[in-house]
């Protein structure tokens, strides 16, 4: 799990990078700048 520096509600492939209100990325996603990356 990688800490995000901003609310990452950016969508990729039609799915949210992380749920609204969450402070950390989960589900194999991480936030990088304004991109959601699968790790």
From Swiss-Prot:
Compartment annotation: Secreted
Gene Ontology CC: one annotated term: extracellular region
Matching PROSITE patterns: HWTX_2
Keywords: Disulfide bond, Neurotoxin, Secreted, Toxin
Record InterPro entries: Hwtx-2-like
SUPFAM superfamilies: omega toxin-like (SSF57059)
Function of the protein: Inhibits voltage-gated calcium channels (Cav) in rat cerebellar granule cells. Has insecticidal activity.
Protein family according to the UniProt entry: Belongs to the neurotoxin 12 (Hwtx-2) family. 06 (TXP1) subfamily.
Misc remark: The primary structure of the mature peptide is identical to that of Eurypelma spider toxin 2 from Aphonopelma californicum (AC P61510).
Name of the protein in question: Omega-theraphotoxin-Bs1b
The species this protein was found in: Brachypelma smithi (Mexican red knee tarantula)
């Amino acid at each position: 799990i990688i800490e995000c520096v901003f609310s990452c509600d950016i969508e990729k492939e039609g799915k949210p990078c992380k749920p609204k209100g969450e402070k950390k990325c989960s589900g194999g996603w991480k936030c990088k700048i304004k991109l959601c990356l699968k790790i």
